[in-house]
Amino acid sequence: MDTTLSHTPGSRLSQYLALTKPRVTQLAVFCAVIGMFLATPGMVPWKVLLGGTIGIGLLAGSAFAINCLVEQKIDAMMRRTAWRPSARGEITTLQILAFSTVLGGLGAWTLYTFTNPLTIWLTIATFVGYAVIYTLLLKPMTPQNIVIGGASGAMPPALGWAAVTGAVPGDAWILVLIIFVWTPPHFWVLALYRRKDYENAGLPMLPVTHGEQFTRLHILLYTVILFAVTMMPFISGMSGAVYLTSAVLLGALFLAYAWKIYRDYSDALARRAFRYSIVYLSLLFAALLVDHYARPVIGM
């Protein structure tokens, strides 16, 4: 008698939810919401906030489901991803396609109903950039997959900004640039301590193709560039002292991790740096939000 939970409604729901990579989706949606609030000096209209958040989240989940479908054989060979229901064969190809289509359709309809055409097209372009260009073309072909493909993953703040204003001005692109430059060191520290996984799966990640030392150097270089780029919101006048102080402190710790990885690497250190990189981006964007509403009050 089969006593597993794989056929219960709750476990089936959790399997489908896992396809959307909830933690990654949450971070993407969080950055999009910050983009919405930074786009206006007041409050975001609740219909735009709700519709934009749900629509962007659904389309992001749809793209991640396609990623799981395309990479199910690769995921099955990697310890980090072998647990995914797609890799374990617990959900069929047709079911994943149907699930992704429903999510994508609902997301596009929600954005059409509550936002504007620019937001829809930008979000769909982001979907194609991640699910097709990155997943199918870049990731299995070049060690620069993260650098080039990071453009689609960096778009959420621009999507949020467009949802509110119907435009994507320079300040929104600064936010995109921050995530774009953050992406390589974030993923490369993961690739360092998961190098064997990527090697076994045949993926040309930087540590596999160019070695550990080369990757460690580039993590440091990109983290230095990231520190400089995070000064741009203050330099452009978009943010004030609250953000600047936060960016300097958060960036200094990220630089310390990158320097330590370069000089005295260990897998345990890389794991801590990877976890911190997620906290770093979340707190950096939270600081942008706090500064946005605190600045008129404190005058800094």
Swiss-Prot record:
<dbReference type="GO" id="GO:0048034">
    <property type="term" value="P:heme O biosynthetic process"/>
</dbReference>
<keyword id="KW-0997">Cell inner membrane</keyword>
<feature type="transmembrane region" description="Helical">
    <location>
        <begin position="94"/>
        <end position="114"/>
    </location>
</feature>
<keyword id="KW-0472">Membrane</keyword>
<feature type="transmembrane region" description="Helical">
    <location>
        <begin position="217"/>
        <end position="237"/>
    </location>
</feature>
<dbReference type="InterPro" id="IPR044878">
    <property type="entry name" value="UbiA_sf"/>
</dbReference>
<feature type="transmembrane region" description="Helical">
    <location>
        <begin position="172"/>
        <end position="192"/>
    </location>
</feature>
<feature type="transmembrane region" description="Helical">
    <location>
        <begin position="48"/>
        <end position="68"/>
    </location>
</feature>
<dbReference type="GO" id="GO:0008495">
    <property type="term" value="F:protoheme IX farnesyltransferase activity"/>
</dbReference>
<feature type="transmembrane region" description="Helical">
    <location>
        <begin position="239"/>
        <end position="259"/>
    </location>
</feature>
<keyword id="KW-0350">Heme biosynthesis</keyword>
<feature type="transmembrane region" description="Helical">
    <location>
        <begin position="118"/>
        <end position="138"/>
    </location>
</feature>
<dbReference type="Pfam" id="PF01040">
    <property type="entry name" value="UbiA"/>
</dbReference>
<feature type="transmembrane region" description="Helical">
    <location>
        <begin position="278"/>
        <end position="298"/>
    </location>
</feature>
<keyword id="KW-0812">Transmembrane</keyword>
<dbReference type="InterPro" id="IPR030470">
    <property type="entry name" value="UbiA_prenylTrfase_CS"/>
</dbReference>
<dbReference type="InterPro" id="IPR006369">
    <property type="entry name" value="Protohaem_IX_farnesylTrfase"/>
</dbReference>
<feature type="transmembrane region" description="Helical">
    <location>
        <begin position="146"/>
        <end position="166"/>
    </location>
</feature>
<comment type="pathway">
    <text>Porphyrin-containing compound metabolism; heme O biosynthesis; heme O from protoheme: step 1/1.</text>
</comment>
<comment type="similarity">
    <text>Belongs to the UbiA prenyltransferase family. Protoheme IX farnesyltransferase subfamily.</text>
</comment>
<keyword id="KW-1133">Transmembrane helix</keyword>
<keyword id="KW-0808">Transferase</keyword>
<dbReference type="GO" id="GO:0005886">
    <property type="term" value="C:plasma membrane"/>
</dbReference>
<feature type="transmembrane region" description="Helical">
    <location>
        <begin position="24"/>
        <end position="44"/>
    </location>
</feature>
<keyword id="KW-1003">Cell membrane</keyword>
<protein>
    <recommendedName>
        <fullName>Protoheme IX farnesyltransferase</fullName>
        <ecNumber>2.5.1.141</ecNumber>
    </recommendedName>
</protein>
<dbReference type="InterPro" id="IPR000537">
    <property type="entry name" value="UbiA_prenyltransferase"/>
</dbReference>
<comment type="function">
    <text>Converts heme B (protoheme IX) to heme O by substitution of the vinyl group on carbon 2 of heme B porphyrin ring with a hydroxyethyl farnesyl side group.</text>
</comment>
